[in-house]
Design a protein with these regions (language model features):
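Predominantly soluble domains enriched in secretory-pathway, periplasmic, or organellar proteins
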Residues: 18-392
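Bacterial N-terminal signal peptides
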Residues: 7-16
Length: 392
């Protein structure tokens, strides 16, 4: 009897072990935002496959994603103010809150313990515990002259020194929030930086915060190594120019590419990629391209740029050689190419083709398509390797 019971127990334990999900890493995982259905697809780059779909994430029409340091969790910032923590291994929502009424992006702190969200409504930044999503801090933006609303906040990035840096669209400011001493941040405000900063980036070395201006030409630059020097205007010609050309889609400043000591910048309203000396911030060239560029994405080795475009040229992607500035490929993946993402080592390029209802995987060296995955109105593609890139 005892022997039978022990045998039964051993078999049960063995079957239980077999039924468990096998251990795996998350370094080759990512997500595709399905904007029309409020869902994410969890993707695996090694096998060019979609592993699961996570639903119930709200309005993802302008969604962005950051990742925990262990690359297990994706934090999804929805346009409806939703902040969702998604477990990539179990393919489920770990936690979800509604923290505002209209949000435009977020960031994760240098130590991975804080999540910041920038809000249009109510204007400001809220900061949360990355593990529990409990609110840590509320940073209201500057009141507008009517004293009823606060400025909308854009261009939120993480910066070295446990800081978040962001821009105030309506009041023309850049703020830095330093959390290095605890949950009450030290706020540094820079006013009069220019009209209507609409988006921003931080350079890969974490030194310069660059805000694009919608209300005038030029960019506002804050040297985070020397904030006491204040904000200065650079790239005075960058913008729509005196002709005020129609802009079908403002370029994303995350779409700047840094390669070979140059910055490759999507021009505003012009069919050009601008080339800047990244030490002196002076223009050195302008590359003619097929349309108004939205993203200019560098292959991790810096040798190639992949460029997508605003309507009506958003069915095309052009590839530029960063040494010769020549266009080496003119691809037509399909209607409405919205986003592009390289894998961490640059062996694959993933494209979202919204109106084609698919995500494509390309070999960027041979310029050949490797795979196609169905998706529901796909937009942003984000790999978990972003967890270890400042500003991402």
């Amino acid at each position: 009897m005892i022997r039978s019971l022990l045998s039964f127990t051993a078999i049960a334990m063995l079957l239980s072990a077999c039924a468990q999900t096998p251990l795996r890493g998350t370094g080759d995982l990512g997500v595709v935002v399905e904007r029309a259905t409020g869902s994410l697809q969890i993707i695996e780059s090694d096998t060019h496959t979609a592993l699961a779909r996570v639903e119930g994430l709200g309005d993802l029409s302008h969604a962005s994603v950051v990742f925990s340091r262990d690359q297990r969790y994706a934090y999804v910032f929805g346009r409806d103010g939703g902040l969702s923590k998604v477990d990539l291994l179990s393919a489920r929502i770990d936690r979800r809150i509604i923290q505002g009424g209209n949000s435009i992006g977020g960031a994760i702190s240098q130590d991975g313990k804080l999540i910041a969200v920038s809000n249009y409504e109510p204007g400001g930044v809220k900061v949360f515990n990355a593990r529990t999503l409990e609110q840590i801090a509320d940073i209201p933006a500057t009141l507008l002259p009517d004293r009823q609303k606060r400025s909308r906040v854009v261009g939120l990035v993480d910066a070295p020194g446990q800081r978040f840096v962001f821009s105030l669209f309506d009041t023309g400011e850049i703020w830095s929030a330093d959390f290095s001493q605890g949950p009450t941040p030290r706020i540094e405000r820079f006013t009069g930086i220019g009209q209507q900063p609409y988006d921003a980036l931080i350079t890969p070395d974490g030194r310069y915060y660059m805000a694009g201006l919608f209300g005038e030409d030029g960019m506002a630059q804050l040297d985070l190594w020397h904030p006491e020097r204040g904000v200065k205007r650079v790239l005075g010609h960058y913008g729509r120019g005196q002709a005020r050309l129609p802009v079908y889609k403002m370029p994303h400043l995350e779409g700047w590419a840094m390669a070979d000591r140059h910055a490759f910048v999507p021009a505003v309203g012009h069919h050009q990629v601008l080339v800047m000396d990244a030490r002196r911030w002076q223009p050195v060239d302008a590359i003619a391209v097929a349309g108004q560029p939205v993203f200019v994405t560098a292959r991790p080795d810096g040798r190639q740029l992949w460029v997508n475009f605003a309507y009506p040229d958003n069915d095309r992607v052009q590839v530029i050689d960063t040494q010769t500035h020549a266009i080496v490929a003119d691809l037509k993946p399909g209607p409405a190419v919205l986003h592009m993402e390289f894998t961490a080592r640059g062996d694959q390029m993933w494209l979202s083709v919204r109106d084609g209802g698919e995500v494509q995987v390309w070999d960027p060296y041979r310029l050949e398509r490797l795979a196609t995955l169905p998706a529901q109105s796909p937009s942003g593609i984000f790999f978990s390797s972003r967890a270890h890139k400042p500003g991402y």
